[in-house]
Amino acid sequence: MAKVSSIKKNESRKKKSQSLHNKRLALKSKIYDKNISLEERFSLVMSLAQLPRNSSSTRIRNRCELTGRPRGVTRKFGISRNKLRELIGRGLVPGVVKSSW
């Protein structure tokens, strides 16, 4: 089980990222617009830098929904490989069966 503080920190990053997503997109589209003058684009870069770091979507960590484990998380299920193997072994994941040949 992961530390509760790291799970909470990741949740707050998700919330900040969602709330400032549109503002970041608008600033980035203006920054990459070649029709705007260089000085104005530089001021837009500075305003983007003033936004909180945790509002960036790249700072969000993919974590297991059950344990909070940060590594080995499958995108399809949102569960770490260990828990996924355990649940599949018990037959609790619909549509997935353990293969044998």
Curated annotation (Swiss-Prot):
Gene3D superfamilies named in the record: 1.10.287.1480
InterPro entries: Ribosomal_uS14 (IPR001209), Ribosomal_uS14_bac/plastid (IPR023036), Ribosomal_uS14_CS (IPR018271)
Keyword Calcium: no
GO biological process, one term: translation
Keywords noted in UniProt: Ribonucleoprotein, Ribosomal protein, RNA-binding, rRNA-binding
Basic residues bias: start-end ranges: 11-22
Any one GO MF annotation of this record: structural constituent of ribosome
Positions of region (Disordered): 1-22
Family annotation (HAMAP family): Ribosomal_uS14_1
Description of how the protein assembles with itself and partners: Part of the 30S ribosomal subunit. Contacts proteins S3 and S10.
Described function: Binds 16S rRNA, required for the assembly of 30S particles and may also be responsible for determining the conformation of the 16S rRNA at the A site.
Family: Belongs to the universal ribosomal protein uS14 family.
Protein name as annotated: Small ribosomal subunit protein uS14
Gene name linked to the record: rpsN
